[in-house]
């Protein structure tokens, strides 16, 4: 054991570096070859008169900013309350600091020099645009950083703070009438482009990724023309949620006029008439009122505002528009299953004829489409359908970038028999199984090694194939089409 060599190796890591606003100091991760910079500001606090505005630039600071701890999470319902599946799985700390001043990001890097130019992952968390934060255990970027990428997790405003619309907002700031959370994500990406070289990252090799609402956020960023040239690849995990049996999709952006009416109703519920009054209220009072409001009204999320979001990002992808980059997307096997509601075979035939017209017989010729469950007939993953439809459309419209589909179907242990539930794949992509309460065993860790290696290869090259980090050749993963 050579203590001097260990100390020398630690000194060779990037523990301190500069950003456009000042110096930052990180902290060694559990693996001393990795430096974690937590709570790095990328925009000014969206508080006071900056509430419900596009993110503004940070002010410069003197000295060295200590970035050893995570910054407060964005204002939302208090995490960690109750014994639901997701509280048990992720939101385990009801005392986690929370503040409207929340526009910070976190960086994990194993670079030894600012000249390393490592590929970069920019991650957006999920939570239905209502909840979620970067300090969730599963998003620890250390394991991925060990494989030679720089990992960045971006915090953003959620719920009413991130997605309020109102006629007064549209009139006062037509350049940014809504989608403040999406603009936070975009500002985080732009900060990475400008600053990540000082953390050993390559600003010309950035993959954006996210899960659930984070995956839908990736779709929104790909649809934004202003991001042209900033994104070299994308991963959408469980973020395209549709159904072959319905005309509408879950999470389709809200038209501005509809969103403005929801905002007007909320102001009335809040007991205010003007933006000035609303901006003067305490953030936690607004949060609590919004939670009550959402019991009987639609929640606030992405809006077709004509500026950041000009149309449905999924529709744009189907038509071969938006940023065309290598794309990986998929789903877990037990999430968002859709069914045909029918009580027997006769009613199934009638429903099939309504849905598929002259192709009903062809649909029913597949035995799996006659399968009946307690929820109905013909169970199918709405996400799998949506992803494959998008991939086929990309190909048909002339996109020459590869599309890689995955279906995550691991056995998930635990007394709750939760199945392959929505979000369980996050432990595997980030290879953070050891942080979870579930009794994962050796074959789960082997699977996580393979999955994270596919993910890292994709970040590095736009192609998941190659070797895992132990230099074992991975099974070939062919493009979907």
Regions found by a protein language model. Give the residues of each.
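Glycine-rich nucleophile elbow surrounding the catalytic serine of serine-hydrolase chemistry
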Residues: 210-220
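Short, Lys/Arg-enriched N-terminal segments with co-localized hydrophobic residues
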Residues: 1-12
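Mobile gating loops/cap/lid regions near enzyme active sites that modulate substrate access
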Residues: 80-81, 389-481
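Substrate-access "cap/lid" subdomains that shape
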Residues: 194, 220-223, 228, 233, ...
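Active-site rim elements
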Residues: 91-95, 174-179, 246-254, 369-383, ...
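Alpha/beta-hydrolase active-site loop
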Residues: 175-197, 257-261
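Non-catalytic accessory segments of hydrolases
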Residues: 12-179, 203, 296, 440-451, ...
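Alpha/beta-hydrolase fold nucleophile elbow
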Residues: 200-211
């Amino acid at each position: 054991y050579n203590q001097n060599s260990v100390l020398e190796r630690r000194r060779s890591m990037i523990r301190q570096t500069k950003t456009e606003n000042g110096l930052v100091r990180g902290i060694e991760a559990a693996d001393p070859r990795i430096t974690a910079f937590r709570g790095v500001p990328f925009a000014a606090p969206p508080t006071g008169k900056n509430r419900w505005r596009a993110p503004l630039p940070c002010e410069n600071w003197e000295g060295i900013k200590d970035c050893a701890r995570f910054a407060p999470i964005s204002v939302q319902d208090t995490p960690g309350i109750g014994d639901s599946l997701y509280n048990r799985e992720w939101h385990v700390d009801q005392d986690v600091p929370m503040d409207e001043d929340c526009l910070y990001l976190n960086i994990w890097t194993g670079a030894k020099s600012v000249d390393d130019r490592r590929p970069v992952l920019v991650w957006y968390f999920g939570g239905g645009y209502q909840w979620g934060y970067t300090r969730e255990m599963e998003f620890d970027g250390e394991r991925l950083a060990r494989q030679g990428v720089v990992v960045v997790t971006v915090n953003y405003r959620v719920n009413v703070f991130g997605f309020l619309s109102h006629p007064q907002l549209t009139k006062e700031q037509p350049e940014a009438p809504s989608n403040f959370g999406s603009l936070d994500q975009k500002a985080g990406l732009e900060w990475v482009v400008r600053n990540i070289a000082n953390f050993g990252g390559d600003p010309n090799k950035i993959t954006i990724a996210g899960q659930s609402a984070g995956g839908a956020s990736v779709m929104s960023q790909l649809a934004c023309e202003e991001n042209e040239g900033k994104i070299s690849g994308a991963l959408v995990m469980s973020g395209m949620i549709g159904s072959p049996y319905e005309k509408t999709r879950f999470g389709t952006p809200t038209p501005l006029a509809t969103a403005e009416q929801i905002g007007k109703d909320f102001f009335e519920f809040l007991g205010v008439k003007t933006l000035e009054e609303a901006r003067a209220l305490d953030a936690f009072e607004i949060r609590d009122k919004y939670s009550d409001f959402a019991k009987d009204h639609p929640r606030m999320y992405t809006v077709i505002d004509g500026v950041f979001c000009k149309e449905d990002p999924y529709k744009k992808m189907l038509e071969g528009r938006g940023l065309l980059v290598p794309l990986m997307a998929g789903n877990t096997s037990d999430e968002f299953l859709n069914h045909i509601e029918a009580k027997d075979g006769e009613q199934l035939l009638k429903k099939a004829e309504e849905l598929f017209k002259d192709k009903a017989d062809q649909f029913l010729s597949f035995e799996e489409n006659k399968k009946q469950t307690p929820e109905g007939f013909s169970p199918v993953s709405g996400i799998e359908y949506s992803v494959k439809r998008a991939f086929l459309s990309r190909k048909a419209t002339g996109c020459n970038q590869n599309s890689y589909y995955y279906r995550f179907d691991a056995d998930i242990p635990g007394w709750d028999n939760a199945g392959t539930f929505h979000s369980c794949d996050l432990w595997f992509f980030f290879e953070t199984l050891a942080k979870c309460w579930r009794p994962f065993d050796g074959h789960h860790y082997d699977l996580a090694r393979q999955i994270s290696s596919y993910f890292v290869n994709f970040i590095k090259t736009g192609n998941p194939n190659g070797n895992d980090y132990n230099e074992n050749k991975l099974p070939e993963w062919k493009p979907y089409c």
